[in-house]
C-alpha cells in the first residue's frame, strides 16, 4: 500500500512525458496548468484548515507500525523524522493524481483507463497507511477536479500556449 501511495507523482510524469515527447505542447501545458492550479488551491485550503493527519491525531490507537518491505521501512523513517503537522486537508497526493487523471481523460483517453485503477488504489492507500482521513481524500478529489476545470477555462483563452520547446 505504501507503493500505491507513492505513485501519485508518477501519473503527472508519465502523462507529461508522453505529451512533451509527442510534441503536443497545448496538451502538455494544459496538464501542467491543471496540476499547478490543483496544488495551489490545495495549499491555500490547507492554510485555512490545518488538519493533522491520523498519523499524529490517532497515534495511540494503532496496534504497531505498518509492516512491509523496504519501502514501508523508509516511509516509517521519513514519517518519524520529517512529517508535517497540520497539512492533511485536502490530500495533495490525491489532488495531483486526480488532476493528472482528468488531463489523461482530455488528452490521452487510453492512458486515463490505465491510470484509473492505480489512482483509485492510491486513494484507498492514503487512508490505509494512516496519512489521511476519508474527508481529506474527498477534498483532494474536489481540489484536483477544480484544478482541471479552472485550467480548462484558462487554456481556452487565445494565446494561452505561446511557448515552444
Where on the chain are the PLM-derived regions?
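Aromatic-anchored segments of alpha-helical transmembrane domains
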Residues: 39-46, 119-128
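Membrane-interfacial catalytic/cofactor-binding modules of polytopic membrane enzymes
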Residues: 44-107
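N-terminal transmembrane-helix/juxtamembrane module of multi-pass inner/ER membrane proteins
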Residues: 1-11
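Membrane-interface capping segments at transmembrane-helix boundaries
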Residues: 152-164
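Interfacial helix-loop-helix junctions of multi-pass membrane proteins
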Residues: 53-54, 88, 121-147
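Divalent metal-coordination and catalytic microenvironments
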Residues: 9, 31, 50, 93, ...
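Interfacial segments of alpha-helical transmembrane regions
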Residues: 13-49, 57
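Membrane-interfacial alpha-helical segments at the cytosolic side of multi-pass membrane proteins
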Residues: 14-21, 94-112, 142-151
Amino acid at each position: 500500500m505504501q507503493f500505491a501511495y507513492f505513485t501519485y507523482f508518477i501519473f503527472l510524469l508519465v502523462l507529461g512525458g508522453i505529451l512533451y515527447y509527442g510534441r503536443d505542447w497545448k496538451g502538455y501545458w494544459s496538464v501542467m496548468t491543471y496540476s499547478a492550479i490543483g496544488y495551489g488551491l490545495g495549499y491555500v485550503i490547507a492554510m485555512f484548515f490545518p488538519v493533522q493527519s491520523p498519523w499524529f491525531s490517532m497515534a495511540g490507537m494503532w496496534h504497531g507500525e505498518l509492516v512491509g518491505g523496504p519501502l514501508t521501512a523508509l516511509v516509517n523513517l521519513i514519517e518519524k523524522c520529517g512529517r508535517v503537522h497540520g497539512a492533511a486537508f485536502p490530500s495533495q497526493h490525491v489532488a495531483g493524481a486526480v488532476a493528472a487523471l482528468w488531463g489523461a481523460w482530455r488528452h490521452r483517453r487510453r492512458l486515463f483507463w490505465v491510470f484509473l485503477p492505480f489512482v483509485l488504489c492510491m486513494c484507498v492507500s492514503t487512508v490505509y497507511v494512516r496519512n489521511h482521513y476519508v474527508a481529506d481524500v474527498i477534498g483532494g478529489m474536489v481540489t484536483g477536479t477544480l484544478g482541471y476545470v479552472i485550467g480548462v477555462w484558462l487554456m481556452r483563452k487565445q494565446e494561452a500556449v505561446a511557448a515552444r520547446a
